[in-house]
Protein backbone atom coordinates (compact mmCIF):
# COMPACT_ATOMS: atom_id res chain seq x y z
CA UNK A 1 0.00 0.00 0.00
CA UNK A 2 1.52 3.31 -1.15
CA UNK A 3 0.14 6.50 0.40
CA UNK A 4 0.96 10.14 -0.36
CA UNK A 5 0.18 12.75 2.31
CA UNK A 6 -0.47 16.15 0.71
CA UNK A 7 -0.12 19.06 3.14
CA UNK A 8 1.46 22.45 3.76
CA UNK A 9 3.61 22.00 6.87
CA UNK A 10 5.52 19.37 8.82
CA UNK A 11 7.09 19.47 12.28
CA UNK A 12 9.87 20.28 12.99
CA UNK A 13 10.64 21.80 9.58
CA UNK A 14 7.72 24.25 9.57
CA UNK A 15 4.91 24.61 12.07
CA UNK A 16 2.06 27.09 12.46
CA UNK A 17 -0.38 24.69 14.15
CA UNK A 18 -1.26 21.12 15.09
CA UNK A 19 -1.38 19.97 11.46
CA UNK A 20 2.43 20.07 11.40
CA UNK A 21 2.63 17.78 14.45
CA UNK A 22 0.40 15.23 12.73
CA UNK A 23 2.46 15.19 9.53
CA UNK A 24 5.67 15.08 11.56
CA UNK A 25 4.59 11.83 13.24
CA UNK A 26 1.87 9.93 11.33
CA UNK A 27 3.83 8.95 8.17
CA UNK A 28 6.69 7.49 10.25
CA UNK A 29 4.18 5.50 12.33
CA UNK A 30 2.56 4.25 9.12
CA UNK A 31 5.92 3.14 7.74
CA UNK A 32 6.48 1.17 10.96
CA UNK A 33 3.00 -0.32 10.40
CA UNK A 34 3.93 -1.57 6.93
CA UNK A 35 2.53 1.24 4.76
CA UNK A 36 4.80 2.97 2.22
CA UNK A 37 3.88 6.52 3.25
CA UNK A 38 5.45 9.62 1.71
CA UNK A 39 4.75 13.35 2.05
CA UNK A 40 4.26 16.10 -0.55
CA UNK A 41 4.99 19.67 0.58
CA UNK A 42 5.58 23.08 -0.99
CA UNK A 43 9.29 23.92 -0.85
CA UNK A 44 8.88 26.76 1.65
CA UNK A 45 12.34 28.01 2.73
CA UNK A 46 12.44 26.23 6.11
CA UNK A 47 11.27 22.97 4.55
CA UNK A 48 13.67 23.21 1.62
CA UNK A 49 16.62 23.77 3.99
CA UNK A 50 15.62 20.80 6.12
CA UNK A 51 15.47 18.22 3.33
CA UNK A 52 19.17 18.19 2.56
CA UNK A 53 19.32 15.23 0.15
CA UNK A 54 16.63 16.42 -2.29
CA UNK A 55 17.15 15.33 -5.90
CA UNK A 56 15.26 16.32 -9.06
CA UNK A 57 12.48 13.91 -10.07
CA UNK A 58 10.68 15.91 -12.74
CA UNK A 59 10.24 19.37 -14.24
CA UNK A 60 6.90 20.68 -15.48
CA UNK A 61 5.29 23.79 -16.88
CA UNK A 62 1.96 24.23 -15.07
CA UNK A 63 -0.92 26.71 -14.82
CA UNK A 64 1.03 28.25 -11.91
CA UNK A 65 4.35 28.49 -13.74
CA UNK A 66 7.40 26.28 -14.01
CA UNK A 67 8.00 23.80 -11.17
CA UNK A 68 10.62 21.25 -10.23
CA UNK A 69 9.58 18.16 -8.27
CA UNK A 70 12.27 17.10 -5.80
CA UNK A 71 12.53 13.99 -3.64
CA UNK A 72 14.52 13.52 -0.46
CA UNK A 73 14.15 12.25 3.08
CA UNK A 74 13.58 13.61 6.55
CA UNK A 75 13.73 11.40 9.66
CA UNK A 76 13.38 8.30 7.51
CA UNK A 77 10.29 9.53 5.63
CA UNK A 78 10.32 10.14 1.87
CA UNK A 79 9.54 13.79 1.10
CA UNK A 80 8.48 15.26 -2.25
CA UNK A 81 8.96 19.01 -2.59
CA UNK A 82 7.34 21.33 -5.11
CA UNK A 83 10.16 23.73 -5.89
CA UNK A 84 8.60 26.90 -7.31
CA UNK A 85 10.51 29.89 -5.88
CA UNK A 86 8.13 32.42 -7.47
CA UNK A 87 5.34 30.95 -5.31
CA UNK A 88 6.94 29.56 -2.18
CA UNK A 89 10.29 31.27 -1.53
CA UNK A 90 9.01 33.95 0.84
CA UNK A 91 10.08 34.74 4.41
CA UNK A 92 7.86 34.13 7.42
CA UNK A 93 4.45 32.51 7.35
CA UNK A 94 3.54 30.20 4.48
CA UNK A 95 0.08 31.79 4.26
CA UNK A 96 0.42 35.54 4.73
CA UNK A 97 2.85 38.44 4.56
CA UNK A 98 4.44 40.30 7.46
CA UNK A 99 1.36 42.54 7.73
CA UNK A 100 -0.79 39.41 8.18
CA UNK A 101 -2.50 39.85 4.81
CA UNK A 102 -3.08 36.58 2.95
CA UNK A 103 -0.92 36.35 -0.15
CA UNK A 104 -2.98 37.42 -3.16
CA UNK A 105 -1.80 34.41 -5.17
CA UNK A 106 -2.71 31.81 -2.51
CA UNK A 107 -5.27 30.41 -4.92
CA UNK A 108 -2.44 29.40 -7.28
CA UNK A 109 0.02 28.44 -4.53
CA UNK A 110 -2.32 25.87 -3.02
CA UNK A 111 -4.16 24.82 -6.17
CA UNK A 112 -0.71 23.76 -7.40
CA UNK A 113 -0.21 21.67 -4.25
CA UNK A 114 -3.43 19.76 -4.96
CA UNK A 115 -2.62 19.47 -8.67
CA UNK A 116 0.80 17.93 -8.03
CA UNK A 117 -0.77 15.53 -5.51
CA UNK A 118 -3.15 14.30 -8.22
CA UNK A 119 -0.38 14.21 -10.86
CA UNK A 120 1.61 11.91 -8.57
CA UNK A 121 -1.19 9.36 -9.01
CA UNK A 122 -0.80 9.71 -12.79
CA UNK A 123 2.94 9.01 -12.89
CA UNK A 124 4.67 12.34 -12.20
CA UNK A 125 7.31 10.22 -10.45
CA UNK A 126 7.73 7.31 -12.89
CA UNK A 127 9.19 5.11 -10.13
CA UNK A 128 6.49 5.55 -7.46
CA UNK A 129 2.80 6.30 -7.54
CA UNK A 130 0.33 6.28 -4.64
CA UNK A 131 -2.65 3.97 -4.22
CA UNK A 132 -4.16 6.58 -1.89
CA UNK A 133 -3.73 10.35 -1.92
CA UNK A 134 -4.35 11.58 1.64
CA UNK A 135 -4.98 15.35 1.65
CA UNK A 136 -4.99 17.50 4.79
CA UNK A 137 -7.06 20.66 5.38
CA UNK A 138 -8.00 23.31 2.84
CA UNK A 139 -4.47 23.84 1.53
CA UNK A 140 -4.62 20.39 -0.08
CA UNK A 141 -8.38 20.38 -0.67
CA UNK A 142 -8.17 20.47 -4.47
CA UNK A 143 -6.22 17.19 -4.66
CA UNK A 144 -9.41 15.05 -4.57
CA UNK A 145 -11.01 17.38 -7.14
CA UNK A 146 -8.09 17.02 -9.56
CA UNK A 147 -8.21 13.24 -9.04
CA UNK A 148 -11.94 13.26 -9.85
CA UNK A 149 -11.27 15.30 -13.01
CA UNK A 150 -8.72 12.66 -14.09
CA UNK A 151 -11.03 9.68 -13.58
CA UNK A 152 -9.75 8.88 -10.08
CA UNK A 153 -6.39 7.18 -10.78
CA UNK A 154 -6.03 6.76 -7.00
CA UNK A 155 -8.37 6.69 -4.02
CA UNK A 156 -8.50 9.83 -1.89
CA UNK A 157 -8.89 10.58 1.79
CA UNK A 158 -9.43 14.12 3.07
CA UNK A 159 -8.71 14.87 6.73
CA UNK A 160 -10.34 17.85 8.41
CA UNK A 161 -8.06 19.26 11.10
CA UNK A 162 -10.16 22.40 11.55
CA UNK A 163 -13.33 23.13 9.57
CA UNK A 164 -13.11 26.83 10.46
CA UNK A 165 -10.46 27.43 7.79
CA UNK A 166 -12.09 27.05 4.39
CA UNK A 167 -9.79 28.44 1.70
CA UNK A 168 -12.29 30.70 -0.11
CA UNK A 169 -11.45 32.37 -3.44
CA UNK A 170 -13.35 34.34 -6.09
CA UNK A 171 -15.19 32.31 -8.71
CA UNK A 172 -13.26 33.81 -11.64
CA UNK A 173 -10.18 31.88 -10.48
CA UNK A 174 -11.77 28.77 -12.02
CA UNK A 175 -10.14 30.11 -15.18
CA UNK A 176 -6.71 29.88 -13.53
CA UNK A 177 -6.63 26.47 -11.83
CA UNK A 178 -7.28 24.00 -14.66
CA UNK A 179 -10.47 22.46 -13.33
CA UNK A 180 -13.63 22.25 -15.46
CA UNK A 181 -16.25 24.93 -14.80
CA UNK A 182 -18.76 22.10 -14.26
CA UNK A 183 -17.04 21.57 -10.90
CA UNK A 184 -18.18 25.06 -9.85
CA UNK A 185 -21.50 23.79 -8.61
CA UNK A 186 -23.36 23.28 -5.35
CA UNK A 187 -22.59 19.61 -6.01
CA UNK A 188 -18.91 20.42 -6.25
CA UNK A 189 -16.54 23.06 -4.93
CA UNK A 190 -18.86 26.09 -5.02
CA UNK A 191 -19.82 27.56 -1.67
CA UNK A 192 -21.65 30.87 -1.25
CA UNK A 193 -20.74 31.88 -4.79
CA UNK A 194 -17.02 31.29 -4.30
CA UNK A 195 -14.50 28.48 -4.72
CA UNK A 196 -14.02 26.62 -1.45
CA UNK A 197 -10.88 24.47 -1.33
CA UNK A 198 -12.21 22.89 1.85
CA UNK A 199 -15.53 21.92 0.25
CA UNK A 200 -13.65 20.54 -2.75
CA UNK A 201 -11.86 18.12 -0.44
CA UNK A 202 -15.06 17.21 1.38
CA UNK A 203 -17.10 16.71 -1.79
CA UNK A 204 -14.66 14.85 -4.04
CA UNK A 205 -12.78 12.65 -1.52
CA UNK A 206 -13.67 8.97 -1.38
CA UNK A 207 -13.62 9.22 2.41
CA UNK A 208 -13.46 12.07 4.95
CA UNK A 209 -11.84 11.77 8.35
CA UNK A 210 -11.91 14.21 11.23
CA UNK A 211 -9.21 14.19 13.88
CA UNK A 212 -11.43 12.73 16.61
CA UNK A 213 -14.65 10.67 16.70
CA UNK A 214 -16.57 13.39 18.58
CA UNK A 215 -15.47 16.10 16.13
CA UNK A 216 -16.61 13.86 13.25
CA UNK A 217 -20.08 13.88 14.83
CA UNK A 218 -20.01 17.58 15.72
CA UNK A 219 -19.26 18.75 12.17
CA UNK A 220 -22.57 17.31 11.00
CA UNK A 221 -24.32 19.83 13.30
CA UNK A 222 -25.04 23.44 12.22
CA UNK A 223 -23.20 25.07 15.15
CA UNK A 224 -19.90 23.42 14.12
CA UNK A 225 -20.26 23.02 10.34
CA UNK A 226 -20.08 26.62 9.01
CA UNK A 227 -22.88 25.97 6.54
CA UNK A 228 -21.54 22.66 5.16
CA UNK A 229 -23.61 20.43 7.46
CA UNK A 230 -25.81 19.17 4.60
CA UNK A 231 -22.87 17.65 2.72
CA UNK A 232 -21.32 16.27 5.90
CA UNK A 233 -24.61 14.72 7.04
CA UNK A 234 -24.87 13.05 3.62
CA UNK A 235 -21.31 11.70 3.86
CA UNK A 236 -22.10 10.40 7.35
CA UNK A 237 -25.20 8.57 6.07
CA UNK A 238 -23.11 7.08 3.26
CA UNK A 239 -20.53 5.79 5.75
CA UNK A 240 -17.89 8.07 4.23
CA UNK A 241 -17.15 10.18 7.34
CA UNK A 242 -15.30 8.89 10.39
CA UNK A 243 -13.04 10.08 13.19
CA UNK A 244 -9.46 8.96 13.80
CA UNK A 245 -7.90 10.35 16.95
CA UNK A 246 -4.53 12.06 16.65
CA UNK A 247 -1.64 10.65 18.62
CA UNK A 248 1.36 11.85 20.61
CA UNK A 249 4.85 11.63 19.16
CA UNK A 250 6.53 9.83 22.04
CA UNK A 251 10.01 10.55 20.66
CA UNK A 252 9.34 14.22 21.45
CA UNK A 253 6.75 14.12 24.25
CA UNK A 254 7.77 11.70 26.99
CA UNK A 255 8.69 12.77 30.54
CA UNK A 256 10.99 9.76 30.79
CA UNK A 257 13.30 10.96 28.00
CA UNK A 258 12.51 14.69 27.64
CA UNK A 259 15.86 16.51 27.79
CA UNK A 260 14.07 19.87 28.09
CA UNK A 261 12.91 19.01 31.62
CA UNK A 262 14.88 19.89 34.74
CA UNK A 263 14.08 16.42 36.08
CA UNK A 264 12.86 13.43 34.08
CA UNK A 265 10.34 11.02 35.60
CA UNK A 266 7.95 8.13 34.96
CA UNK A 267 4.57 7.10 36.39
CA UNK A 268 6.54 5.11 38.99
CA UNK A 269 8.85 8.01 39.94
CA UNK A 270 6.32 10.87 40.03
CA UNK A 271 8.07 12.38 43.04
CA UNK A 272 10.76 13.52 40.57
CA UNK A 273 8.18 15.79 38.90
CA UNK A 274 8.43 18.16 41.89
CA UNK A 275 11.76 19.66 40.77
CA UNK A 276 10.17 20.65 37.45
CA UNK A 277 7.45 22.50 39.35
CA UNK A 278 10.02 24.33 41.49
CA UNK A 279 12.01 25.40 38.43
CA UNK A 280 8.84 26.51 36.61
CA UNK A 281 7.72 28.59 39.60
CA UNK A 282 11.11 30.30 39.64
CA UNK A 283 11.10 30.89 35.88
CA UNK A 284 7.60 32.40 35.93
CA UNK A 285 8.18 34.58 39.00
CA UNK A 286 5.77 32.57 41.14
CA UNK A 287 6.10 31.84 44.84
CA UNK A 288 7.97 28.56 45.22
CA UNK A 289 5.50 26.33 47.06
CA UNK A 290 4.88 22.66 46.37
CA UNK A 291 1.70 22.68 48.49
CA UNK A 292 -0.38 24.81 46.09
CA UNK A 293 -1.72 23.51 42.75
CA UNK A 294 -0.10 25.13 39.72
CA UNK A 295 -2.52 25.54 36.80
CA UNK A 296 -1.11 26.22 33.34
CA UNK A 297 -2.15 27.41 29.90
CA UNK A 298 -0.16 26.75 26.72
CA UNK A 299 -2.32 28.07 23.92
CA UNK A 300 -3.18 30.59 21.29
CA UNK A 301 -5.06 33.32 23.17
CA UNK A 302 -8.41 33.28 21.36
CA UNK A 303 -12.06 32.97 22.30
CA UNK A 304 -12.18 29.65 20.38
CA UNK A 305 -9.69 28.32 22.93
CA UNK A 306 -11.89 29.64 25.78
CA UNK A 307 -9.16 31.83 27.23
CA UNK A 308 -11.64 34.61 28.00
CA UNK A 309 -13.27 32.12 30.40
CA UNK A 310 -9.93 31.56 32.15
CA UNK A 311 -9.51 35.31 32.59
CA UNK A 312 -13.02 35.57 34.03
CA UNK A 313 -12.53 32.59 36.36
CA UNK A 314 -9.01 33.57 37.43
CA UNK A 315 -9.93 35.47 40.64
CA UNK A 316 -11.84 32.40 41.86
CA UNK A 317 -8.87 30.15 41.11
CA UNK A 318 -6.49 32.45 42.98
CA UNK A 319 -8.82 32.89 45.98
CA UNK A 320 -8.60 29.13 46.53
CA UNK A 321 -4.81 29.42 46.67
CA UNK A 322 -3.90 28.28 43.17
CA UNK A 323 -1.26 29.65 40.81
CA UNK A 324 -1.38 30.22 37.05
CA UNK A 325 1.47 29.98 34.52
CA UNK A 326 0.55 31.04 30.99
CA UNK A 327 2.46 30.77 27.72
CA UNK A 328 0.71 32.02 24.60
CA UNK A 329 -0.06 34.83 22.20
CA UNK A 330 -3.02 36.00 20.18
CA UNK A 331 -5.90 38.36 20.85
CA UNK A 332 -4.39 41.66 22.11
CA UNK A 333 -7.29 42.14 24.54
CA UNK A 334 -6.64 38.76 26.14
CA UNK A 335 -2.89 39.38 26.18
CA UNK A 336 -3.41 42.66 28.03
CA UNK A 337 -5.87 41.00 30.40
CA UNK A 338 -3.42 38.30 31.44
CA UNK A 339 -0.51 40.75 31.72
CA UNK A 340 -2.67 42.94 33.97
CA UNK A 341 -3.50 39.89 36.11
CA UNK A 342 0.21 39.09 36.45
CA UNK A 343 0.83 42.66 37.63
CA UNK A 344 -2.12 42.53 40.05
CA UNK A 345 -1.25 39.12 41.52
CA UNK A 346 2.57 38.94 41.67
CA UNK A 347 3.78 35.54 42.82
CA UNK A 348 0.48 33.93 41.87
CA UNK A 349 0.23 34.63 38.13
CA UNK A 350 3.11 34.33 35.67
CA UNK A 351 2.63 35.24 32.00
CA UNK A 352 4.93 34.86 29.02
CA UNK A 353 3.55 36.26 25.76
CA UNK A 354 4.78 34.38 22.71
CA UNK A 355 5.36 30.73 21.95
CA UNK A 356 8.51 28.74 22.70
CA UNK A 357 8.42 25.01 22.00
CA UNK A 358 11.11 24.27 24.59
CA UNK A 359 9.37 26.26 27.33
CA UNK A 360 6.07 24.50 26.60
CA UNK A 361 7.80 21.24 27.62
CA UNK A 362 8.95 22.83 30.88
CA UNK A 363 5.40 23.97 31.63
CA UNK A 364 3.99 20.54 30.85
CA UNK A 365 6.54 18.92 33.13
CA UNK A 366 6.13 21.42 35.97
CA UNK A 367 2.41 22.21 36.18
CA UNK A 368 -0.16 20.19 38.10
CA UNK A 369 -3.17 21.00 35.88
CA UNK A 370 -3.26 22.02 32.20
CA UNK A 371 -6.29 24.13 31.24
CA UNK A 372 -7.92 23.47 27.83
CA UNK A 373 -11.37 25.13 28.06
CA UNK A 374 -11.97 25.31 24.29
CA UNK A 375 -15.34 26.22 22.80
CA UNK A 376 -14.52 23.71 20.09
CA UNK A 377 -11.45 21.54 19.65
CA UNK A 378 -11.19 19.16 16.68
CA UNK A 379 -8.70 16.93 18.48
CA UNK A 380 -6.36 18.88 20.69
CA UNK A 381 -2.82 17.80 21.48
CA UNK A 382 -2.26 19.84 24.64
CA UNK A 383 -4.49 17.61 26.76
CA UNK A 384 -2.72 14.52 25.38
CA UNK A 385 0.64 15.97 26.42
CA UNK A 386 -0.86 16.67 29.85
CA UNK A 387 -2.00 13.06 30.23
CA UNK A 388 1.42 11.82 29.14
CA UNK A 389 3.19 14.06 31.70
CA UNK A 390 0.83 13.44 34.62
CA UNK A 391 -0.32 17.06 34.38
CA UNK A 392 -4.05 16.53 34.73
CA UNK A 393 -6.09 18.14 31.93
CA UNK A 394 -9.05 20.35 32.81
CA UNK A 395 -11.11 20.51 29.61
CA UNK A 396 -14.51 21.33 28.15
CA UNK A 397 -16.48 18.39 26.78
CA UNK A 398 -16.08 19.00 23.04
CA UNK A 399 -14.32 17.36 20.09
CA UNK A 400 -11.20 15.39 20.90
CA UNK A 401 -11.21 16.68 24.47
CA UNK A 402 -14.38 14.64 25.07
CA UNK A 403 -12.75 11.54 23.56
CA UNK A 404 -9.56 11.65 25.61
CA UNK A 405 -10.24 12.97 29.14
CA UNK A 406 -12.51 11.29 31.73
CA UNK A 407 -13.74 13.40 34.64
CA UNK A 408 -12.71 12.63 38.21
CA UNK A 409 -16.28 11.79 39.18
CA UNK A 410 -16.80 9.29 42.00
CA UNK A 411 -17.90 6.64 39.48
CA UNK A 412 -14.85 7.15 37.26
CA UNK A 413 -12.53 7.13 40.26
CA UNK A 414 -14.11 3.87 41.43
CA UNK A 415 -13.82 2.36 37.94
CA UNK A 416 -10.19 3.45 37.58
CA UNK A 417 -10.78 5.53 34.44
CA UNK A 418 -10.56 9.09 35.83
CA UNK A 419 -7.85 11.14 34.13
CA UNK A 420 -8.74 14.83 34.57
CA UNK A 421 -11.57 17.32 34.98
CA UNK A 422 -14.35 17.91 32.44
CA UNK A 423 -16.99 20.66 32.31
CA UNK A 424 -19.95 21.03 29.97
CA UNK A 425 -21.06 24.61 29.45
CA UNK A 426 -18.91 27.29 27.89
CA UNK A 427 -19.07 29.79 30.75
CA UNK A 428 -16.85 30.84 33.64
CA UNK A 429 -19.18 29.39 36.29
CA UNK A 430 -18.98 25.91 34.78
CA UNK A 431 -15.19 26.25 34.48
CA UNK A 432 -14.95 27.34 38.13
CA UNK A 433 -16.88 24.27 39.27
CA UNK A 434 -14.33 22.08 37.49
CA UNK A 435 -11.49 24.09 39.09
CA UNK A 436 -13.15 23.49 42.47
CA UNK A 437 -13.18 19.73 41.79
CA UNK A 438 -9.46 19.95 41.00
CA UNK A 439 -8.80 21.60 44.39
CA UNK A 440 -10.82 18.90 46.18
CA UNK A 441 -8.80 16.14 44.52
CA UNK A 442 -5.57 18.07 45.23
CA UNK A 443 -6.45 17.97 48.93
CA UNK A 444 -6.26 14.16 48.73
CA UNK A 445 -2.65 13.57 47.61
CA UNK A 446 -2.84 9.78 47.34
CA UNK A 447 -5.94 10.03 45.13
CA UNK A 448 -4.27 12.73 43.00
CA UNK A 449 -1.25 10.46 42.51
CA UNK A 450 -3.58 7.56 41.59
CA UNK A 451 -5.24 9.66 38.86
CA UNK A 452 -1.84 10.84 37.58
CA UNK A 453 -0.76 7.23 37.16
CA UNK A 454 -4.03 6.39 35.40
CA UNK A 455 -3.52 9.29 33.00
CA UNK A 456 0.09 8.40 32.23
CA UNK A 457 -0.85 4.78 31.48
CA UNK A 458 -3.22 5.75 28.65
CA UNK A 459 -2.12 4.87 25.10
CA UNK A 460 -2.37 7.73 22.62
CA UNK A 461 0.56 6.63 20.49
CA UNK A 462 0.58 7.21 16.74
CA UNK A 463 0.67 3.44 16.23
CA UNK A 464 -3.04 3.35 17.16
CA UNK A 465 -3.91 5.99 14.53
CA UNK A 466 -1.66 4.35 11.93
CA UNK A 467 -3.53 1.06 12.32
CA UNK A 468 -6.91 2.83 11.94
CA UNK A 469 -5.78 4.58 8.75
CA UNK A 470 -4.35 1.35 7.30
CA UNK A 471 -7.70 -0.37 7.81
CA UNK A 472 -9.47 2.58 6.15
CA UNK A 473 -7.15 2.57 3.12
CA UNK A 474 -7.72 -1.14 2.53
CA UNK A 475 -11.50 -0.68 2.75
CA UNK A 476 -11.26 1.91 -0.04
CA UNK A 477 -9.25 -0.30 -2.42
Swiss-Prot record:
Pfam families: Glyco_transf_5, Glycos_transf_1
Alphabetical GO biological process terms: glycogen biosynthetic process
Entry binding sites for ADP-alpha-D-glucose: 15
Alphabetical list of InterPro entries matching this protein: Glyco_trans_1 (IPR001296), GS/SS (IPR011835), Starch_synth_cat_dom (IPR013534)
Annotated EC: 2.4.1.21
Residues spanning the membrane: none
Catalytic reaction(s) noted: [(1->4)-alpha-D-glucosyl](n) + ADP-alpha-D-glucose = [(1->4)-alpha-D-glucosyl](n+1) + ADP + H(+)
Function: Synthesizes alpha-1,4-glucan chains using ADP-glucose.
UniProt family annotation: Belongs to the glycosyltransferase 1 family. Bacterial/plant glycogen synthase subfamily.
The protein's name in its UniProt record: Glycogen synthase
Organism: Escherichia coli (strain UTI89 / UPEC)
